[in-house]
Design a protein with these regions (language model features):
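Membrane-interface segments at the starts/ends of alpha-helical transmembrane spans
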Residues: 1, 65-66, 137-140
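Hydrophobic cores of alpha-helical transmembrane segments in multi-pass integral membrane proteins
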Residues: 3-26, 36-57, 69-91, 105-128, ...
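Surface-exposed, proline-enriched loop/turn segments that connect beta strands in immunoglobulin-like
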Residues: 100-101
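Interfacial helix-loop-helix junctions of multi-pass membrane proteins
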Residues: 127-135, 139
Length: 174
């Protein structure tokens, strides 16, 4: 799962962060909170994700140093991941009132919240003592589903709600 985790992480994290960084400011009609934070968090994710894969191979025949390295890099991923989450939520500073009536922003806030929860769970589950309890349980399955359905699906639905009316020359879905 070393390669698999990195492939999933890059396809389901980096690409959808791009969707968030494009559509969230468009819909909120505000600039992204911190361009510098977005650059820093993206490149830190790229650097750290490469070595995060071994956290799925704890308590296997993989050498201990590799398992420890994977665990360490996974825990370190919490910082850049939450940098992206905070950047997304802070972009809405001054536009939280729009959340009451705007379904696109609702989908995006739910997605960003799931991204935050998922990226908190992942590093915690990578810690050896937590992994000993959580491995081979439904917690791992729930973690994957919160990332895939909560983060990826919700940000995608929000983006589709933004794009579909514009494809047909309208400003809003209804």
């Amino acid at each position: 799962w070393w390669y698999g985790h990195n492939a999933v992480g890059f396809f389901l994290t980096a690409g959808f962060l791009g969707i968030m960084y494009y559509f969230l400011p468009k819909q909120a009609q505000l600039p992204i909170y911190s361009y510098r934070l977005s650059i820093l968090h993206f490149w830190t994710l790229v650097f750290l994700y490469i070595w995060a894969g071994p956290h799925h191979l704890l308590y296997t025949a993989l050498p201990d140093w590799t398992q420890t390295l994977g665990m360490t890099f996974s825990v370190m991923l919490l910082v850049p991941s939450w940098g992206g989450m905070v950047n997304g939520l802070m972009t809405l500073k001054g536009a939280w009132d729009k959340l009451r009536t705007d379904p696109i922003l609702k989908f995006m806030v739910v997605a960003i919240s799931f991204y935050g929860m998922s990226t908190f769970e992942g590093p915690m589950m990578a810690i050896r003592t937590v992994n000993a309890l959580s491995h081979y349980t439904d917690w791992g399955i729930g973690h994957v589903h919160s990332g895939a359905l909560g983060w990826v699906a919700m940000i995608s639905i929000g983006a589709l709600y933004y794009m579909i009316p514009r494809v047909f020359g309208k400003k809003e879905m209804y």
